Amino acid sequence: RNHSSAASDVYKRQLVRFRKKISTEKRKQYMDQTYWGKPVTGFGDINGKIMIVGLAPAAHGGTRTGRVFTGDKSSDFLYKCLHNVKIANQSNSDHVNDGLKIKNTFITPALKCVPPGDKPLNEELKNCFGYFKSEFEILKNLKIIVALGKIAFDTCVKFYRENFNYTERVKFGHGTYFKLPNNVLLMGCYHPSPRNVNTGRINEKQMTKLFKKVKELV
């Protein structure tokens, strides 16, 4: 076994340990709930033309509920905007049986497990590329990827560099988009995190406008 393979196993074990820690210690208000506590994959319409890529499942959101962007403040904000443009049938995403449906869209985290401090390491992201790739391959009608935040954006670029020999220099910007090798567009979007919302970096009007643009592009 080579050094990189052994190192990769170390990072995997670290993530699994942290995921289990979150799921057993829980947050006070969710003490009576059983946390999903496993990797969180994508959700939505596999025939869709839009793919929304987040960073990773939230510690007490996706890691608790088992569905990406579900049960936390970021998901409340995101779905309010997706409902505004009729991508989502409702403006909330609370738990897996809440009746949520999304149209023409697939949502997935770049990293399938919650990382410590919400800061994934490059090695952790690389470990998830295989799963990410299999989701890409399922989405036969994909036309546009919306990357929520710079890390998700850079991960998509890295993925295309490794799998499609993509060499263009691109830079993350809210609403800025680029053409990728297989005729898919990649658009940057500020992450709907409470920090970004509370500091005014992103608001409902801006994000709704961005998703209106996304719908026009497809």
Give the residues covered by each predicted segment.
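Single conserved hydrophobic/aromatic residue that forms the stacking wall/gate
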Residues: 2-7
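Short, surface-exposed acidic-centric catalytic microdomains
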Residues: 77-123
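Glycine/proline-rich loop-helix segments at beta-alpha junctions forming the active-site rim
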Residues: 1, 110-218
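A structural signal for short, well-ordered beta-strand segments and their strand-loop junctions
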Residues: 52, 91, 107, 144-149
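Residues lining hydrophobic/aromatic ligand-binding pockets adjacent to catalytic sites
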Residues: 23, 62-65, 141, 202
